[in-house]
Amino acid sequence: MSGVRGLSRLLSARRLALAKAWPTVLQTGARGFHFTVDGNKRASAKVSDSISAQYPVVDHEFDAVVVGAGGAGLRAAFGLSEAGFNTACVTKLFPTRSHTVAAQGGINAALGNMEEDNWRWHFYDTVKGSDWLGDQDAIHYMTEQAPAAVVELENYGMPFSRTEDGKIYQRAFGGQSLKFGKGGQAHRCCCVADRTGHSLLHTLYGRSLRYDTSYFVEYFALDLLMENGECRGVIALCIEDGSIHRIRAKNTVVATGGYGRTYFSCTSAHTSTGDGTAMITRAGLPCQDLEFVQFHPTGIYGAGCLITEGCRGEGGILINSQGERFMERYAPVAKDLASRDVVSRSMTLEIREGRGCGPEKDHVYLQLHHLPPEQLATRLPGISETAMIFAGVDVTKEPIPVLPTVHYNMGGIPTNYKGQVLRHVNGQDQIVPGLYACGEAACASVHGANRLGANSLLDLVVFGRACALSIEESCRPGDKVPPIKPNAGEESVMNLDKLRFADGSIRTSELRLSMQKSMQNHAAVFRVGSVLQEGCGKISKLYGDLKHLKTFDRGMVWNTDLVETLELQNLMLCALQTIYGAEARKESRGAHAREDYKVRIDEYDYSKPIQGQQKKPFEEHWRKHTLSYVDVSTGKVTLEYRPVIDKTLNEADCATVPPAIRSY
């Protein structure tokens, strides 16, 4: 770490001069601005003023660049470095501050440590959980790879909770079954107490230090560098010293996480601002299925902090003001461990019908105090602490007040199961050369219309690794990096300059709050056409208000006002596509529940035998992916659709799961 400390001293010594005469600081020739976490090397970099004399740009060249250093980004980055690729990792946060750290419940894999299990049963549950909007080839790949992925993490040193005989402990989780839904509740969720994400992220970070990856830490990625339909790297802002960097690479992996902060109440970190999703949009590429936003059933009432599904997996129950275990009415078999969309809607209905708890009757209770205190202390130690801090509740004596809270984005950047980003042209999927995506930023689509709990950490490691393997298959370390135009990234720098000196009438924080409240009010657990239409108008107006922003910090050193404004631009693009996609989808499927279109509209009516039915044309049913585009200059949203992939990778080994009516 001596290299990190040395660079910190260097930057601190120059900070005052940089603030006073920033444009001249970079004009002294070649120098390295970034660092490797282990301090072993500096990549060569050259300064040029080809874009602007006011904003000189530092140019770098790598075999591959990964944007984001959460679970997916780290796994992709060190997978590439391990294969010999000269790899950069650009992240606006230090890696262990990424939002992966907040995941609590666990990671699904059919290890069979608690009872007989099979990855094909996991495959079935995931397809069913997706409400048949998931692509079955990608789900096949993820669930088959899951056991090996968990064993790999164990070999990296991840300290999984253990059974008495030393095996990885696996808890029950929502939507998980045995024998294709006919064998009862599965115990498939591998965990580290209730801090699995924290453990996973630190394990991957520790592993990454073995490899010679160049980390650009606290660098904000502004845009992709696109040339002739190919991705050739990214342009980024160094938050610490205000320098601009073009990182040219033959392969670019986007792993920037979700965009939960489009909503007022969410479990996401304040840094979950959809940066990669917005970069894809500005590049003229589509995003997929952004209308599918998961509400986690158990966010702490009034605070929004996550209470893991593992609480219910360990035996916790949801109760209403009458003391009823109400999930028995809505999901007679799975009860409190039905899929998240089912539980969130059931809770909302209980509150609507007057059975909510508290003085306002606007939440329900999660009861844990019937469980043995030693079980709570061993399996749910973090939850006990969180409940006391944010709700003032001793979980051994009283229930936790909870309410559905925005938690996860099923949609994102469309990819295939290899992590390659797709565009849809003339009815056919086409790969975008040089561009990959993984993690919550991507939409493979393994989650479809609703993600099963504990499939997200699995998604990170499986598809982060898949991106590295795909690049290894198609490229060699040291391959020539395609050139970029001398002024590549010029628009990004112009936008940054415009925001830096924005002198309108609306603060960034005010506009962000208006957007978040509009999304919360108009695109929540239950949706209706008239409210969605009103929401579309409001978000479009707010998008137009971006040109009236006012920023206050004109400097370039740690200008968080500027960074938050750049993040707001990204959030707005995500919000537009989310609410317009939701308004257009005239059905209820998974997390998208329309009160004016209460049924799922498939190519057949699967509540009846399909023999004798005429298949609906593609234009008349909704079992299809939404592709959304935004004209960045006007905010106009354009929607297209692409078919769901029903075929698995090997039908003889893993049969397709045909659509059916979903019940738990």
From Swiss-Prot:
The record's GO CC annotations read: mitochondrial inner membrane; mitochondrion; respiratory chain complex II (succinate dehydrogenase)
EC numbers, comma separated:
1.3.5.1, 1.1.5.-
Q: In which pathway does it act?
A: Carbohydrate metabolism; tricarboxylic acid cycle; fumarate from succinate (eukaryal route): step 1/1
Per its Swiss-Prot or TrEMBL entry, what cofactor is needed? Answer: FAD
- Transit peptide range per the UniProt entry: 1-42
The reply on keyword Magnesium is no
Which residues constitute the catalytic centre?
A: 340 (proton acceptor)
The entry's keywords: Acetylation, Electron transport, FAD, Flavoprotein, Membrane, Mitochondrion, Mitochondrion inner membrane, Oxidoreductase, Phosphoprotein, Transit peptide, Transport, Tricarboxylic acid cycle, Tumor suppressor
Residue positions, PTM Tele-8alpha-FAD histidine: 99
* Modulation of this protein's activity: Enol-oxaloacetate inhibits the succinate dehydrogenase activity.
Look at the named UniProt entry and state the broad enzyme category this protein falls under.
oxidoreductase
Positions modified as N6-acetyllysine?
A: 167, 179, 182, 250, 335, 480, 485, 498, 517, 538, 541, 547, 550, 598, 608, 624, 636, 647
The PTM N6-succinyllysine maps to: 179, 250, 335, 485, 498, 538, 547, 615
Which GO biological process categories is it annotated with?
mitochondrial electron transport, succinate to ubiquinone; respiratory electron transport chain; succinate metabolic process; tricarboxylic acid cycle
User: Principal localization?
Assistant: mitochondrion
Annotated FAD binding lies at: 69, 72, 91-92, 98, 100, 105, 221, 275, 440, 456-457
Q: How does it assemble?
A: Component of complex II composed of four subunits: the flavoprotein (FP) SDHA, iron-sulfur protein (IP) SDHB, and a cytochrome b560 composed of SDHC and SDHD. Interacts with SDHAF2/SDH5; interaction is required for FAD attachment. Interacts with TRAP1. Interacts with LACC1.
**Per its record, how is this protein called by name?**
Succinate dehydrogenase [ubiquinone] flavoprotein subunit, mitochondrial
Origin organism of this chain? Answer: Pongo abelii (Sumatran orangutan)
